Every structure is written in structure tokens, then in C-alpha cells.
Amino acid sequence: MIPRPPGGLPLLGHLVPFLRDPLAFLRSLPRYGGLVQIRLGPVSAVVVCDLELTRHVLREDRVFDKGGFLFERVRDFAGNGLVTCPHADHRRQRRYVQPAFRADRIARYTEVMAREARRLAGSWNDGQEVDITAELSLAAGRSLVSTLFTRLPFTGLQETVDDFVLLIGGSYRRMLLPHRLNRIPLPANRRYDAARTRLVRLVDEVVTAYRADPEDRGDLVSTLVAADAGGQALSNAEVTDQVMTIFAAGFDTIANSTVWALHLLAQHPDIADRVRAEVDAARVDAVGVNVPGANAPEADALGVDRAEAGATTAAGTSPSVDGLELTTRVVREAVRLYSPGWLLTRVTSTDTELGAHRLPEGTSVIYSPYLLHRQPALFPEPDRFDPERWVGVHPQRGPFIGFGAGPRRCVGEQFGMTESVLLLATIMRAWHLEHVPGRTVREMPLATLRPGPVWMRATRRDGLVRTGAAG
């Protein structure tokens, strides 16, 4: 029999301690065994607390399929995209989406990433107090929309970002509410439905235009429209699902990991000094602020002058993260400590066994990268921020599962890591950031593990940034 933690209540089960402090509740479970049975209101689930059992779940994705109480609600927003689709659809969808994240495509996207990083770093004033959670969310949203679409047919960049962000925020609320309440025409539901309608219309019009003129525009949607697996292209509706999925998966990962990295570096000024030395030595002015073309006129609705993109990079090359090994390790360590996907679910598609326990078909299975990454048997001193633990370590071969594992490992891992490293390097090149006294930084385990507002004072590094330059 699978052990159960004490404290379960009639009807509620373990819902009270879970809602009170979800992260502490999760970290309390391994003492009861590698598999633990919990109940959250009407939902019964098995929590996997052991690394090898988790790897088995992720490896055997036909048996432990995408699903469960979280994924069913995510599909309401993201549709049947690569992240949310069942095993039966996954291989086909991956063949369509994989080309959009090849190294040569990511190299093209970095031009947009670098411009948005410069825009952000150039928008602050010396001594200004900024909420970097809000600032990085804006930068990540703009960058993602700009890499998805070269042009927006009937709306502006910020309006599109706002619609995506509204859907992501609303999706968590809708996960927690009974499904029938989401159909009531309340103001929040009307705003959510209107935003999704606008985005579906936007993607449909873009895809229709791209099919009529099938040149490669260098963006993600161009790759999806051109994808052809076995002589069959994606339909407009399928492209829409992939766009929703890519934005949802990338937005919080990029913004959150960069915010947590800045927060951790402010707590460890010795490591922050080493990062600044690295970005200075690597000449991050090639991707950062104060470089030729940084304030060139904007040529399209995205704020990206693509015709002059080469002017912003050294010797006409795309920005890269070469030479930023420590900065990359800092981001990786931030993802370990604060994995965006802190709680994920699968569902058994057939009767099976896990850890010598029988699981019937339809069992909800929970696994948590946050839980595994905080286990001392897997990561010595797991609560300590230590980028050096990644020296000479291949993340995919160890206990790190911040981007998943097995056949469903995140296809956009390199994309997300590259953007986070570019953002972090550009900010660290231009600014000293320190926490505003009296402000508390809170973990917010919602749909992803988000930071609450992180207020920091930005002090200019002399001569390395022109403030107020970004519009």
C-alpha cells in the first residue's frame, strides 16, 4: 500500500497544508517514501519523491501520458500543442516544431533577444527603484512575440503581449475553479475569452498571409508554416496551438529564471562581481547596450529594425553566449533552485507498476523538479546558491530535470537558456542592482514558480549605459 502523510481531513484531504505552503508540503513528503499518496479535495494523486522513479515516469511517456488535473486545464488555454498533447500526437508534433529550435534558427532569434535586452537596460535611470519582476516579464513577452511574428497585421506589439499575459495569468485561476464557473460571463471570463479570440484571429491571419507568400521571414511562425512531415502541413488551428504553447512555456521560464538569477546575485555580491568581469571580458557590448545601431529607427510593428540587425552585432554576426560560462551556470543554478515547472502531472494510460506498487489506469501522478532539486542526496547543500556545482557537469546526465527528461524533454531549452543568459549579461554589464531595504521577495507557486515583486535599486556602471534611450 502506498503510504499517506498524516493530517488528511474528510472531504479536503491534504488540501489545507498544500494551499497554506505548497513548497513546504512537497518537501515534507520524501520522509514517507519514494511514492506518497495524497488527496487534494476530490483529486487523489501519487507524488513521486524519488529520482529514479521520476526518470522512469518521464522515460515511459506512453504509459505515463501527459494529463492529470493540471494539464486538462492548461489545454483550455494552450490547446493541443507540443507541451500538452498526448503521447499519440507527440512524435508527429515534435517533427513539426523541432526545426524552429535548431541552433541556426536560435542564432537568428538572438538579434531580437539582444534588442529587447538593450531596450530594457536602456530604459532605467541611475538610482531608480525598479520592480524587476514586472520589467523582465515585459522584456520576455516582447521578445517572445517578436520571435514568433515578424509583423502583426492588426495590432501592436504591446497589445499582443498584454493578451498573452492575461491568458497566462487567467489560466491558473481557471485551473483552481470548477470548470462550469469558467463559462459564466463574469468580467474576468469575458476578458479572458476576448483575449483568446483576438490571439486566435491574429495567428490565423498571420498564417494565411505566410501561406500566400511563403518566404522565410526568420521567425518561429515561418518555420511552423513551412513544416512538412510526411507530406502533410500543420493546419492554421494546429499552428495556433503551437504558438500558444510556445509562448506559455517560454514566457515564465525566461522571465522567472532571469529575475531569480538577479535576486540571487544581489545576495552574493562576490559572484556578481565575477559575472560582471566575465561579461566585460566577453565584450557583451556586442549584445548589450551602447553599441552602434542600438537606437536605430524601428522599421516595423515589433520594434525590430530587421534590415539593420547586423549593425547591432560585432562583425555582422548574431549575438551569442560564447564566453559567458559563469553567467550560464548562474542561470542554470537559478532554474535548479526555482524550477518554473515546480509541480507537473502525468496520468497512467494503462495498469502499471511503479516502485513495486500497482497503479491502475487513470491514476494521477505528480512529480516536482523543485522537490528533487532540493534533496541533499542529489545536490549537496541544496538550498545554497552555488553556480560552481555545474562546472564540468552535463545537466542532462545528472539529477537536474528543470527542462524535463526523456522523450518529452523541453524542445525550447536552448532557446530559453540563451535568452535568459543574454538578458542577464546585458543587465549586469550595464547596472549594479541591489535589493531595496524593507522589501521582501516571495516565492509564488502558481502555474509556475514565480517571484513576487522584486524591488531593486539600479546604479549605473559609468559609461556603459545611456539611460532613457529605449522607447
Where are these regions (language model features)?
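N-terminal membrane-proximal hinge/A-helix region immediately C-terminal to the signal-anchor transmembrane segment
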Residues: M1-R92, A107, E111-R119, F154-T155, ...
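Cytochrome P450 heme-thiolate monooxygenase catalytic core
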Residues: I2-P3, K66-R73, C85, D89, ...
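Conserved cytochrome P450 K-helix E-x-x-R motif and the immediately C-terminal K′/meander segment
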Residues: L12-G33, G316-G355, P376
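Cytochrome P450 proximal C-terminal region
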Residues: A117, A140, V165-L166, D280-A282, ...
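Cytochrome P450 fold signature focused on the C-terminal beta-domain
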Residues: P214-G218, R276-R283, T313-L324, L337-A356, ...
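Cytochrome P450 catalytic-core helices
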Residues: T253-A272, R276-E278, Q414-W431
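Intrinsically disordered, low-complexity terminal tails and inter-domain linkers enriched
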Residues: A277-D322, R466-A470
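Conserved cytochrome P450 K-helix/beta-meander segment immediately N-terminal to the heme-binding cysteine loop
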Residues: Y367-V393
